[in-house]
């Protein structure tokens, strides 16, 4: 069940990213591709969530363990994979890979795409996966904190790049 919680978190991230990217572009083909990918990621989330519910009791995976798995997976999203992918796709091949620089460049572009409703949906999906009320008071507080964090980090990265 723990791996299914982690998969729900991955699908939360990818669906919110493609929804944000699709809404940010004016290019109709890219907009449609992103819409379809985001919808597909939501279907994956539902599949993993439904299976996770089946295994929770058998695996003895309570709230705290689910929360730990989810937070661990969120932390892993800051790992080398996205930074290196950004470097490979955007940097001059002669330029050596610098994880910190590539991670910041990727985050600067990605965070700028997000709007509050993307954060609201991501928090609701996260809360649902760990067993919290997706529309409760704690969720609303988390949305405010997460949205502030996205805006703050986006602004800081943009200023640093200027």
Describe every region a protein language model picked out.
Residues 1-162:
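Non-heme di-metal
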